[in-house]
Amino acid sequence: MAITAQMVKELRESTGAGMMDAKKALTETDGDMEAAVDWLRTKGLAKAAKKAGRTAAEGLVGVAVSGGTGVAVEVNSETDFVAKNADFQTMVTGFTQAALSVDDVEALKAADMGGKTVETTLQETIAVIGENMTLRRMAKISGDSVAAYVHNAAADGLGKIGVLVAVKGADNGIAKQIAMHIAATSPMALSEADLDPTLVERERAVQTQKALEENAASAKPKPDSVIENNIIPGRMKKFLEENTLLGQKFVINPDVTVAEAAKQAGVEILGFVRMAVGEGIEKEKEDFAAEVAKTLAG
């Protein structure tokens, strides 16, 4: 398979690898982007990406809590200028409040909002502002108590990253602190049991290959039993601790894990939602010359 400059650019942007390393990785894996990432990681040339794709879309995430229920809603726009528009922000706030009464995004589109459906309100706002918008997704969570946090807030309950944390037990403020922690660390899952088994096995394969190659290149190679019983399990333990909420060191007090902090506060974390604007979306771009030509032609 021919390796293009665009493929090299994409791999470099997703891994931080150098140009020649990225090109070699793609060549070695016949252009398979996912395999190329793993190849770079076995060579110690790239870190694991927590989420595929770059965040390039604009818009806002809205969060709302009512009793023991919390919701997060993402609405995308074409430009950040519209995301700062008061009418757009009011609309997203309305959608978020409406989401408290439904369970999925399709039901939300059909939900009533001031005598009109959410979908109708969206289309009318598009017509007024003159820019395309999308009600992309919603998430709902419940518990004895739910805390919400918005990072980079544009207005009350609106921002680029929205987090919800549901807990069992009387919340004394720890849930809000954990929500702030989640915004900063972006854990993949609540616990090891919640991680995608395919992801875990892929990580194990990467760490196994990396350990074997490092050992083969060592002046004093270790026995295979040490690799299998000590080194690989140790690396997997670190991976799980770094990527599961309960296993992470608590940002506010790194001497304890999040699980320990919750236990000390007398609560059990039931689940969380972390929603970032444009997660997994890559906005189509035009080069500057094409953009100027398009403007002049218009």
Swiss-Prot record:
Keyword Protein biosynthesis: yes
Gene3D superfamilies per UniProt: 1.10.286.20, DNA helicase RuvA subunit, C-terminal domain, Elongation factor Ts, dimerisation domain
GO cellular component: cytoplasm
Entry coiled-coil feature ranges: none
A molecular function (GO) term: translation elongation factor activity
Pfam families per record: EF_TS
Disulfide bonds: none
HAMAP family: EF_Ts
Stated role: Associates with the EF-Tu.GDP complex and induces the exchange of GDP to GTP. It remains bound to the aminoacyl-tRNA.EF-Tu.GTP complex up to the GTP hydrolysis stage on the ribosome.
Entry similarity comment: Belongs to the EF-Ts family.
Identification of the protein by name: Elongation factor Ts
Organism the protein comes from: Cereibacter sphaeroides (strain ATCC 17025 / ATH 2.4.3)
